């Protein structure tokens, strides 16, 4: 009754694997607010909903669909590796260094989906079994021209937004 596996009468089970972009965006530091710090809870993050390919001037010819961003800002501790003296510090000097405030920084991570290409798929590998004797999962997927163009725009737009906000 199930020559292609249970629930796979159409032969589509495992095909059209989709994922989301990963590690695309930008990071920068901010020179202002040196007299400000945070105590307890940190500054809230932000969310920028999809703004590409929603009509008019937002439309792109090099990729379809759109993407958004999530991000935030924070002020870290001063790095203890700014000099050999600081790197070798211990005791009182070490404590003095690590309690100093570092730079304000901000980051934007892009998110958008990868298109459902038919040959992006997962399969069961009956030749490679797990410790319980069950087949392992094999993924075979790649990004294409649409995703490459989208990733390029994700990075460019994140950099532009951070720079216009005063980040370096």
Enumerate the language-model features and the residues they cover.
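FAD-dependent oxidoreductase catalytic-site/capping-region signature
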Residues: 30-37, 44-168
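Glycine-rich loop(s) and the adjacent beta-strand/alpha-helix scaffold that form part
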Residues: 1-39
